[in-house]
Amino acid sequence: MPYLLISTQIRMEVGPTMVGDEQSDPELMQHLGASKRRALGNNFYEYYVDDPPRIVLDKLERRGFRVLSMTGVGQTLVWCLHKE
């Protein structure tokens, strides 16, 4: 899976950071220390870490991921990363 989306809400200085969905690479999620959660009312799971996005981005860079783009949507910040 060469593409990855991560996001955080409201404040980017603190976590949690959403790092994956049900289809994400389990080994990568374990490396990030992510836990699988399902929010009340959702019929899908997401992986979260308590780290702020900067820490997550540093970990992903060490694994060969590079940021392709970043945007803000309302109070949510989203990064798209790619690994060659």
From Swiss-Prot:
Keywords: Cytoplasm, Membrane, Nucleus
GO terms of biological process kind: negative regulation of biosynthetic process; negative regulation of small molecule metabolic process; regulation of nitric oxide biosynthetic process
Family classification: Belongs to the GFRP family.
Disulfide-bonded cysteines: none
Cellular component, GO, one term: melanosome
GO molecular function: enzyme inhibitor activity; GTP cyclohydrolase binding; GTP cyclohydrolase I regulator activity
Protein name according to UniProt: GTP cyclohydrolase 1 feedback regulatory protein
Function, as annotated: Mediates tetrahydrobiopterin inhibition of GTP cyclohydrolase 1. This inhibition is reversed by L-phenylalanine.
Pfam families: GFRP
Compartment annotation: Nucleus; Nucleus membrane; Cytoplasm, Cytosol
Record's subunit section: Homopentamer. Forms a complex with GCH1 where a GCH1 homodecamer is sandwiched by two GFRP homopentamers. Interacts with GCH1.
Main location: nucleus
InterPro entries from the UniProt entry: GFRP_sf (IPR036717), GTP_CycHdrlase_I_reg (IPR009112)
Tissue expression per record: In epidermis, expressed predominantly in basal undifferentiated keratinocytes and in some but not all melanocytes (at protein level).
Name of the gene: GCHFR
